[in-house]
């Protein structure tokens, strides 16, 4: 039986990776290491959707692209308002 005949099982949670908080911490640190203003760069990315605002340094760009922008904004608003439920 070839591998094409087998049903594959996909576990979304297994492939989820880091949560938004951890990702933003890593991206923030990478931006600081490169000498950028992290807040300005992250805001630029969130408003425009252009990943060029985030450097490839320490894989920051790939990390942030694993999350939808609306998911990141939702987490930021919840955190800002203290509603992490």
From Swiss-Prot:
One Pfam family linked to the record: IreB
InterPro entries: IreB
NCBIfam families in alphabetical order: PRK05473.1 (NF003997)
Similarity comment: family membership: Belongs to the UPF0297 family.
Name of the protein described by the UniProt record: UPF0297 protein lhv_0439
Protein source organism: Lactobacillus helveticus (strain DPC 4571)
